[in-house]
């Protein structure tokens, strides 16, 4: 536990890396989902814990890293319990693989609720599996209650639990009505204060607007995306392999190629492993496969998998379980293979450490914010999309800048003629303005795929 928290504190970040992180950070100071602090559904359980920690220590970056460290510990602990339930023995390498996983570590420092949500999802999975395996009614009640809690932390992870819930409804002595009431009790834990803070009518209105927007306007679903199903599928594969496992992809370091050979060997080892589970536990494996398939279809169709690899994180602990099981099985049979694991873990450590080091440097949009705010021009106009404008507006110093939409050609040209300096993320050459500066800002897309490259143009008549 101490190692998980301390390591995440060491790699904490002290800047706002994207628009979603900004909304969660602002929720520590003034929680209001009507003002997108954070965005709907408000993540009240997560924000409550984050606010409590922030009030105790007074540091935004440390707050999210502490939660990330706690979440990492819970993921490791309950993943080992799940692994033991499935194969009836421990895999000592699983803890190391989860601890050093590049995406899990990255999200442990990000100002978001994803990793805390994943820890709850793993706990829910454990209690469902344990109740099914041991016929334990008490653990089943806990599982259903935690499903309700999970919806207040990371509602987009709920589809993963659908096969568990359906199986219990049809096979368990805990009937549909009782199960539903237990889940409702979990929901009411966070829904009651949310209604009190927001108002029922306001909450209803924003929920309808957000659900409609997510699926039909800006949420990155297959309905609104310009990318085909095949493109989305390839991005999911890239997210799992490159972002999630640190595997090789076009443009990546040769070290990730070495890491890839290791993953392939250990996956092969798993496929060759025999008698890794018993017949009476195969129902758990079948349920797990069903959950993975349901969640896969959900993100393929309805999540922004093109720009946000974090949507694949529910897959990672279970992939690492399978690999660690196969690895343990083969090493126990062929002692020589034991020496292969240490160079592999070292490569994984180097890749993850390097990404964490890069994560501590500001993202491209944060670099643009710093450039615009620190530039010595007095009268400033910043032009971009509404979402980029929103990011810059929330930072100290925005009161000295006028923000315009990048398509507002008339307004931009008018301010330019008045002597203002124009900063734009779009090339405005059609407006015949004198360009004074242009430059690209970058960050590693495997740290954060969103806005990994952004260009700024500066125009001034003088």
Give residue spans per PLM region.
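Short acidic/glycine- and proline-prone juxtamembrane loop motifs at membrane-interface regions
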Residues: 40, 103-117, 308
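Signature aromatic-anchored transmembrane alpha helix within multi-pass, membrane-resident enzymes
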Residues: 1, 92, 138-145, 184-188, ...
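Membrane-embedded, lumen/periplasm-facing catalytic core of multi-pass transferases
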Residues: 343-409, 415, 453-454
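Transmembrane-helix motifs of polytopic, lipid-linked glycan transferases
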Residues: 2, 66-88, 123-127, 265-272
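Membrane-lumen/periplasm interface segments of specific transmembrane helices
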Residues: 178-260
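Aromatic/acidic, Gly/Pro-rich catalytic loop(s) in extracytoplasmic/lumenal soluble domains
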Residues: 413-462
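Hydrophobic, aromatic-rich transmembrane alpha-helices
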Residues: 169, 241-282
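Hydrophobic/aromatic-rich transmembrane helices and adjacent perimembrane loops
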Residues: 31, 114, 153, 159, ...
């Amino acid at each position: 536990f101490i190692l998980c928290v301390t390591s995440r504190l060491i790699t904490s970040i002290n800047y706002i890396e994207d628009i979603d992180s900004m909304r969660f950070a602002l929720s520590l100071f003034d929680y209001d989902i009507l003002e997108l602090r954070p965005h709907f559904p408000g993540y009240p359980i997560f924000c409550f814990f984050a606010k409590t920690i922030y009030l105790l220590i007074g540091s935004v970056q440390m707050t999210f890293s502490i939660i990330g460290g706690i979440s990492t510990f819970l993921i490791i602990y309950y993943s080992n319990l799940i692994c033991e339930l499935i194969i009836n023995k421990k895999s000592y390498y699983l803890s190391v693989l989860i601890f050093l996983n590049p995406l899990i570590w990255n999200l442990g420092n990000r100002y978001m609720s994803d990793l805390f949500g994943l820890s709850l999802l793993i706990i829910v999975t454990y209690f469902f599996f344990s109740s099914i395996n041991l016929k334990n009614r008490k653990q089943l009640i806990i599982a259903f209650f935690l499903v309700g809690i999970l919806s207040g932390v990371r509602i987009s992870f709920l589809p993963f639990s659908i096969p568990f819930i359906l199986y219990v409804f049809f096979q368990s002595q805990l009937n549909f009505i009782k199960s539903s009431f237990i889940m409702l009790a979990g929901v009411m834990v966070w829904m009651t204060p949310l209604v009190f803070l927001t108002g029922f009518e306001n909450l209803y209105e924003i929920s309808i607007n957000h659900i409609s927007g997510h699926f039909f306007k800006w949420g990155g679903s297959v309905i609104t995306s310009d990318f085909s199903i095949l493109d989305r599928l390839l991005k999911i594969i890239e997210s799992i392999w490159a972002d999630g496992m640190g595997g090789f992809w076009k443009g990546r370091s040769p070290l990730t190629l070495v890491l890839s050979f290791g993953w392939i060997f250990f996956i092969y080892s798993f496929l060759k492993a025999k008698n890794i589970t018993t017949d009476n536990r195969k129902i758990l494996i079948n349920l797990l496969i069903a959950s993975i398939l349901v969640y896969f279809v959900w993100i393929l169709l309805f999540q922004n998998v093109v720009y946000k690899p974090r949507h694949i994180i529910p897959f990672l602990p279970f992939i690492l379980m399978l690999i660690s099981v196969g690895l343990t099985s083969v090493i126990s049979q062929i002692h020589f293979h034991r020496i292969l694991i240490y160079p592999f873990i070292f490569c994984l450590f180097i890749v993850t450490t390097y990404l964490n080091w890069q994560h501590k440097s500001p993202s491209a949009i944060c670099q643009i914010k710093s450039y615009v705010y620190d530039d010595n021009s007095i009268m400033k106009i910043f032009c971009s999309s509404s979402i980029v404008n929103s990011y810059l507006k929330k930072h100290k110093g925005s009161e000295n800048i006028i923000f315009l939409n990048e398509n507002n050609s008339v307004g931009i040209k008018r301010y330019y003629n008045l002597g203002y300096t124009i900063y734009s993320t779009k090339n405005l050459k059609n407006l015949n303005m004198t360009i004074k500066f242009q430059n690209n800002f970058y960050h590693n897309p495997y740290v954060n795929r969103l806005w990994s490259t952004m260009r700024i143009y500066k125009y001034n008549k003088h």
